[in-house]
Amino acid sequence: MATPANQNGRITQVIGAVVDVQFEGHLPAILNAIETKNGNNRLVLEVAQHLGESTVRTIAMDTTEGLVRGQEVTDTGSPIMVPVGLGTLGRIMNVIGEPVDEQGPVANEGLRPIHAEAPLYTDQSTEAEILVTGIKVVDLLAPYAKGGKIGLFGGAGVGKTVLIQELINNVAKAHGGYSVFAGVGERTREGNDLYHEFIESGVNKKGGGEGSKCALVYGQMNEPPGARARVALSGLTVAEHFRDQGQDVLFFVDNIFRFTQAGSEVSALLGRIPSAVGYQPTLATDMGALQERITTTHKGSITSVQAIYVPADDLTDPAPATSFAHLDATTVLNRAISEKGIYPAVDPLDSTSRMLSPLIVGEEHYQTARMVQQVLQKYKSLQDIIAILGMDELSEEDKIAVARARKIERFLSQPFFVAEIFTGSPGKFVDLADTIKGFRAICEGKYDHLPEAAFYMVGTIEEAVEKGKKLAAEAA
């Protein structure tokens, strides 16, 4: 179908990822997708600003090398549209919904715009049910909510991606519904590994179709900022469609910080004056527009797990600080813990969850979690004294508390299924009842006779006892 002449414009200026386009007698709406050809590729530009009466400033969703001034551009009349529905399962798409897995076109149940309003208050629903992950430190101290938003905070190289992959392994594989994974500005190698791992483990079938349970939407590190700033929305659109069909969807994002970072790269090119630490002035608005759409309605639920990179390990940086407000549970990864060789390197005193209430998790779970935190807090407060005067100067009571805290620290570690190839020890999924029983027994001193090493990298407390016997036999 030929487009009306006035819907065609011409490129007047190209500045990196930002392209200015002039139209005659027609101005595309903000957020509209406009298209042009770049070599043999379809290049989508998204309208970001109106400059004067006839020119729009757009953000390119792909590289702009090869574009020339005067080149013709067409207004599509709608925002970027991505395929949704069962055909997306088992497939990898990019930000504009094109397949990138070389398995042919994506069969879809229609197209949906990536920009949408958040559900109304009256449509939203909240559930107070726990999502059991099989990871001891998470289930005990900062349990996740079904249909909630979960953030994994951590600096570079402390294990966010490994933790998110373990959650996919433990939750998505056992989960009856569908999952969507949005790879935002992370390593292409990890995205590729995840795709093949899903096929090997039976979560997805090669080429998608019947039997596949996870859709993948990637805009990785090598993509221009426009793609990285929008790919989270493309993934969310696929997840929203499943939710509106009555499904319980798992939505994984790795990494939400790259969404902010891409926004800040584009913001400067659009001529906006930067705010604190050089971020875009619209940081809170951009984050809110994304996060408010990730919600559970009366039709279905979206449980989202988001990895959030913390620049220079500073949790007060505007990017992680803005995301804190939107989350139901935060899992904070700490470099000091990873340096001790304790993985997952989750900070038991810094991680929080609104689910840790006796009304939701029950009295026993709540009391055990608080006992564990109390012992660890006491150890933390004694560390200065230990560093200066040594353990001998502590009272008997404090010595016992420190010994228990060190055992708890090690018992919070756990071998992961996805890390088997690196560690050589098989992964462990620990039931919530076993987790509570084990930590309660350590706090009550039932295992004071076991050495610290017995608690390191085991699943249940029974395994720790076995390991203790083995260590004693080796020592003898």
Swiss-Prot record:
Top EC class, one word: translocase
Record: residues binding ATP: 154-161
Places the protein is found: Cell inner membrane
GO-annotated molecular function: ATP binding; ATP hydrolysis activity; proton-transporting ATP synthase activity, rotational mechanism
Reaction equation(s) it catalyzes: ATP + H2O + 4 H(+)(in) = ADP + phosphate + 5 H(+)(out)
InterPro entries, A to Z: AAA+_ATPase (IPR003593), ATP-synt_VA_C (IPR055190), ATP_synth_F1_bsu (IPR005722), ATPase_a/bsu_AS (IPR020003), ATPase_alpha/beta_chains (IPR050053), ATPase_F1/V1/A1_a/bsu_N (IPR004100), ATPase_F1/V1/A1_a/bsu_N_sf (IPR036121), ATPase_F1/V1/A1_a/bsu_nucl-bd (IPR000194)
Similarity section: Belongs to the ATPase alpha/beta chains family.
Name of the featured protein: ATP synthase subunit beta
Gene name linked to the record: atpD
